[in-house]
Amino acid sequence: MIRITKFRCNSFEELSYLVWAGNACVIIDPGFDSEAEFDALHKAIKENGITPSGILLTHAHPDHVYGVHRLCEEWGIPVYANRGEEVTLGALHALCANLGNSDVEDFSSRIKWIEDGDRIFVSENTACVRKADETGTITGMTGGLEFKVLSTPGHTAGGVCYLCREFRKASASEESKNERDAKERYGSTVASQEADKWKVLFSGDTLFAGCIGRSDLPGGDYTALMQGIFTKLLCLDGGIDVLPGHGPATTISEERMKNPFLQPFNEPYEE
């Protein structure tokens, strides 16, 4: 079962997520900016007996990355981000100064670049990336979390969203069948693992409940934002939960039907 703890962080009320299944664990968009916020994270980690294996960034605006450097130093873990965020990362100090907020310590040496369609597999104390065109098995992983990278620029130049589901190592009797149908069922997902349906979308500042991300900041692009939402997000299964970087959770179906920023493309209400 995927478990998620949400933390409201910093003066922007950014939402950071601790995500785990069994002993597989990651942190998404760690905006922790005070001792109280870090204490809340450490309490949740200790109570659940887990250790983060990586940090996933939807984008690199200050409110989403305040805690990255400290957490990387504490656990020695990598940071996954889209290479398009090099522009945002290069402007971090200026953005912090303009906002009048605390500065962000450099964490560039920890970054592992990801691209659209890549999959990040997380097991206990381990995380690795399978590129979109790679197949084959992942050795040493018996199960955990799988994230699929969806490139959704527009709020920033390298913004992404993450689909999330569990995976487990198939039994010996299942492996041959999985080898045959894994690509058909799961695209480029590794063949010797059996995965669940996608359960959750972490949408960062691309899609919110009843709203969309702003595109008037440096690196923003309204056309790209809308294209990403329509071609990458709204086509997903309607039952997928959407956990954004700010505000309440929603679902793909809710946003298809009710989001006023997506008119006149809303679906009709279902009776």
Where are these regions (language model features)?
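Conserved beta-strand hairpin/beta-sheet module of binuclear metal-dependent hydrolase folds
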Residues: 1-48, 162-168, 199-202
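Conserved Rossmann-like nucleotide-binding pocket used by diverse enzymes
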Residues: 3, 56, 148
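A secondary-structure boundary/capping signal
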Residues: 8, 58, 82, 203-204
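Short acidic/glycine-enriched loop/turn segments that link adjacent beta-strands
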Residues: 11-13, 114, 155-158
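The start of beta-strands in P-loop NTPase/AAA+ ATPase cores
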Residues: 24, 53-54, 77, 198-200
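Metallo-beta-lactamase
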Residues: 25, 32-33, 95, 124-130, ...
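Active-site HxH/HxHxD metal-binding segment of metal-dependent hydrolases
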Residues: 33-36, 42-136, 143-145, 168, ...
